[in-house]
Curated annotation (Swiss-Prot):
InterPro entries: PLipase_A2, PLipase_A2_Asp_AS, PLipase_A2_dom, PLipase_A2_dom_sf, PLipase_A2_His_AS. Expressed by the venom gland. This is Acidic phospholipase A2 2. Its EC number is 3.1.1.4. It comes from Pseudonaja textilis (Eastern brown snake).
Length: 154
């Protein structure tokens, strides 16, 4: 066999190994997106919140730029508190990986009673944030602000 023929199977194996390491989308973040859409009556694309201000999206630092960014900061802190709960401290049970039950009825978000302690806490974090988002004005200038103004969130 020609050595070049070994490159194809090797490439496939390396690709499969790489794909196996791609993490799935955290489950409760999917639900959080649904709660945002429910509370906001689908008025905004949920991706508009993915990189807004200093706290909306992954991570967060500095001073929130406005009321909506403060909603995201409070949500981040709520998730931090969830990770400290004994009921949420084992692998795949924290705020990002723990799916919970909820209801959405005409813009009203309710966390259902069948959630355990950890799921109930996470659901309430997301519910509170979704309601906060619905009441806070959205300033287009603050979308992707960390790219527009490099040092604003330090």
């Amino acid at each position: 066999m020609h050595p070049a023929h070994l490159l194809v199977p090797l490439g496939v194996c390396v690709s499969l190994l790489g794909a196996a390491r791609i993490p799935p989308l955290p489950l409760s973040l999917v639900e959080f997106r649904i709660l945002i859409k429910c509370a906001n009556h689908n008025s905004r694309n949920v991706l508009d919140y993915a990189d807004y201000g200093c706290y909306c999206g992954k991570g967060g630092s500095g001073t929130p730029v406005d009321e909506l960014d403060r909603c995201c900061q409070a949500h981040d802190y709520c998730y931090d508190d969830a990770e400290k709960l004994p009921a949420c401290n084992y692998r795949f049970s924290g705020p990002y990986w723990n799916p919970y039950s909820y209801k959405c009825n005409e813009g009203e978000v309710t966390c259902t009673d069948d959630n355990d302690e950890c799921k109930a806490f996470i659901c309430n974090c997301d519910r509170t944030a979704a309601i906060c988002f619905a009441g806070a004005p959205y300033n287009d200038e603050n979308f992707m602000i960390t790219i527009k103004k490099k040092n604003i969130c330090q």
